[in-house]
Amino acid sequence: MIKIRMGVAAVIAAVAFGCVTAPGEKAAGDFTLATFNVRCPADKGELAWYRRMPRVAQVVRDHGFDVFGVQEAVPSEVKILEAELPDFAHVGCGREADRGGESMLIFYNRDRFNCLTNETFWLSETPDRPGSRYTGAGCPRTCTWALLEDRVTGKRFRYFNTHLDHISSKARWNGMQVLLERGVRPAKARGETIFLTGDLNETLDKADDPAAIAALHGPRLTESAKENPIALVSTELKDTYGMSATPHRGTYKTFHGFKGTPSCRIDYIFATPDVKVRSHATLNDKPGGQFASDHYPVAVTVGL
């Protein structure tokens, strides 16, 4: 059984910095999965990448992540995460033609999981061509997936991690179509347990209304909602926000732009209905009083 306990100092720090505390204990067989846009190296001072990556790792440790997907991570950032998180292995590659640049890596605790196979493909009309993109997309976009086997329970699941385009709504829609057609639907047809995480650069509507998100799980999709990649993925998977057995913790919205007050919910964790979601949280941590990224990570504790 994996147990996570917070000491007195950690509790004091949590109160001081207004963060969402980690669960006191995980039941045998449960694990914590998360999505974290770690922000590319585009800032200076306290927000510089080499200052922020240790904070990212601190969030991972504080909340007991067992497996998580990152977005925007470049090789220099990954190198720090590797040093800070020696118990973790990762799979995936960069999005550019030379497989460099920003990556959508999947990190997993090597003591907890075996990676049986993995792949990165491009969200384009030619998914096997590195660096390819849809017309109108601001940059190449990818999906990395891994078939993981839990060393505790022996159960397997397929984990997809992605980052949709920030410029073109059409590219976001098309990209999700590729991801579902190439990855999710075949895995579902085989009866596999699936997780999909990522920064989708999209909300259901401009109001960013939780009730509207919840409506995706019923028969009330409108034609306008069907044009949204969130609605599209929700035809295949469920938003874990609405699956949690306990109330959501932390802010509903996830992107805060280093301001601390998030403006929209664009970071998601989806899963197949067989997943037992124990908790769902947006982690509003500020390790040492400083931001780790311009996005707050989202984490779920689950059982299979």
Give the ranges of each region predicted by the language model.
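Extracytoplasmic/secreted proteins, especially bacterial periplasmic and envelope-associated proteins
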Residues: 51, 55-59, 76, 80, ...
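Short, solvent-exposed loop/turn elements at domain surfaces
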Residues: 40-47, 169, 248-251
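Bacterial N-terminal signal peptides that target proteins for export
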Residues: 1-9
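Metal-dependent phosphoester-hydrolase catalytic domains
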Residues: 170, 184-195, 202-304
